[in-house]
Amino acid sequence: MTTQPFFYVYILESLSDPTRHYTGFTEDLKQRVEHHNAGSVPHTAKFRPWRLQTAIAFTDRERALELERYLKTGSGRAFARRRL
């Protein structure tokens, strides 16, 4: 029996500037957070270190990508601030 992969939508909070957040998608959450904290991701390197604020697991890749796209909109960011 093979295990079904998970797809993650995550929100990071900068520990150096708590007003900074980053929303992303990955299949390997631990490794992706490590990449952000190592400075391997140009968009987030300036505001290291990061802490994982929220992670949501999906079994459906497309649903995960839909949520990521939504959370990157103005109304999605407002939703995340209030609910996540």
Could you describe each region identified by the protein language model?
Residues 1-43, 48, 55, 62-77, ...:
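GIY-YIG nuclease catalytic motif and its immediate N-terminal context
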